[in-house]
Amino acid sequence: MSVKYGKFEMPHKITVDQESPESNFARYVAEPFERGFGHTIGNALRRMMLSSLEAPAIISVRVEGIPHEYMAIEGISEDMTNIILNFKGALLRKLPTEETPRDTRILTKVVEVTQDDLDRNQGQYCVTLQDVVQEGNFEIVNPELHLFTVTKPMRRQVDLRIAFGRGYVPSERHVVRDKTSDEILVDAAFSPVRLINYFIENTRVGQDTDFDRLIMEVTTDGRITPAEALSFAVQIGLKHFEVFNQFNNYALSFDEKDGDRNGDQDELMDKLSLGIDEIELSVRSANCLTGANIETLAELVCIPERRMLEFRNFGKKSLNEIKAKLHEMSLHLGMDLSRFGVSPDNVKDKIKQYREEKKKKKELVKHEDAK
């Protein structure tokens, strides 16, 4: 049986407002949501990204000739306790697949430091993560991570046991059935997500501003990307909801009122077709936009926030002013206008076409009234 519900506002697409591969940060914007759904979706995604995502981590370290972690090592500045602490900071990337399963594996590498190595480095050779982990096994996120400092020639085998998991697992909870007597277990931080923030703002649909815009800021440690974190969290949530679908005795559909949708589009296009000189901006900000060949609001909102600061003479103060002005108009930088057929490539032509069509309609109405 099919059940028909009234119109239910849902986002059509998520836009990437800001992305920085160097810092593993991204800001995502989704709108419009019915009132309250922004918090419902945002909080659920935040909790799943912080608690449920998996990544590889070192769970044990074995250094040849070192029976326990409380031992000092001849020719190495750090004791074994500090070396273990340094290994905890290792970040390794690998997404397990059918071809590369998530089984625990041991990486073995012979670390050799010669007298020539010491002479070239003023008598102290810094062993880093890339000296211990071969690139073919895992992608090394922080290859320059300092592990220990060698002061005498040495040759020792280092074994690292790598496992996949989620959350934070202390060393005493690791289950290693083939553990050797000189293998030292390590606390493992599997969670690849460092920080998740989400914000809810009001957004406009037609004349009504009582809808939610969800803004999510995702920061990872490099073992997964922000896009992967968001995607995996969504799939985890959907998998959990599947069990509740056993009560699916009805096919639910939602009413779409074309007249309302067309009215919303006309109102938005009227707003977007405004010239930069028609909104109240400081002379400096207006001149910066004019210098960047931005003539209309449509051209402005198509630009991601990160690109704005690339414009000549454009600073944080001007950016904040423009963001505040757009917020007053229920707009924001980096908007996705594809459902209206507008993209950064055709925005000038689309706005010109809309203005011409609007002018013709006005002239037609004026002509009809004159009869």
Curated annotation (Swiss-Prot):
Keywords: DNA-directed RNA polymerase, Nucleotidyltransferase, Transcription, Transferase. DNA-dependent RNA polymerase catalyzes the transcription of DNA into RNA using the four ribonucleoside triphosphates as substrates. Belongs to the RNA polymerase alpha chain family. GO terms for molecular function: DNA binding; DNA-directed RNA polymerase activity; protein dimerization activity. This is DNA-directed RNA polymerase subunit alpha. GO terms for biological process: DNA-templated transcription. The N-terminal domain is essential for RNAP assembly and basal transcription, whereas the C-terminal domain is involved in interaction with transcriptional regulators and with upstream promoter elements. It holds the Pfam family RNA_pol_A_bac. Its EC number is 2.7.7.6. Residues 1-248 are annotated as: Alpha N-terminal domain (alpha-NTD). SUPFAM superfamilies: C-terminal domain of RNA polymerase alpha subunit (SSF47789), Insert subdomain of RNA polymerase alpha subunit (SSF56553), RBP11-like subunits of RNA polymerase (SSF55257). Homodimer. The RNAP catalytic core consists of 2 alpha, 1 beta, 1 beta' and 1 omega subunit. When a sigma factor is associated with the core the holoenzyme is formed, which can initiate transcription. Residues 264-371 are annotated as: Alpha C-terminal domain (alpha-CTD). CDD domains: RNAP_alpha_NTD. It catalyses: RNA(n) + a ribonucleoside 5'-triphosphate = RNA(n+1) + diphosphate. NCBIfam families: PRK05182.1-2, PRK05182.2-3, PRK05182.2-5, rpoA. GO terms for cellular component: cytoplasm; DNA-directed RNA polymerase complex.
